[in-house]
Amino acid sequence: MNLARPFRRLVSCAFKSWLTVRSLLPKQKCQTFSKSGSQKGAQIERIFVINLDRAPSRWSNMQQELRRILDSSGDELLNLTDRHVAVDANEFLVDPSKDDDIDPFYTLGDQLFVEPQPLVFPTKFELNFPIRMSRAEIAVARSHINVWRQIVASNYAFALILEDDVWFHNRFSKNLDQAWDEV
């Protein structure tokens, strides 16, 4: 018997209830976001949400989240948001091969260079052992690269990329404004 499953359901139910109750709280205002052409200085002008076509409920949840936060002019962040269709790993007929954008092979050494783990002491052999990205990892990477290209082709000085499973902490606006001011 898997004892973790009942607790996962309980936690999931409690979390969904909490998200519903949050909708009764006042909307947050975040000065870090603004429409293009604003004269208020450097602000995030566009939000891109990566969402699979086969996951419309996740897009609906994101829309609800983005309605909870207001930009510097008092408009919902949803008005600054573009939905970007994610690359679906289920549509790959074969494992994708290396191309100009993505090399599906990496090593533990590559991973530890990007994300150091001080408690991991691998041997030299382990560091150079090739690891193949899963189809899902490749699809995620392609989705992000496609959004980056869209941002580069635009005139947005600053943009935010989100995946469709984000929820905003009740101190999101305050914390982001503070961090943005420090940058």
Model-based region annotation:
Residues L3-L162, V166-V183:
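An acidic/histidine-cluster motif and surrounding catalytic segment
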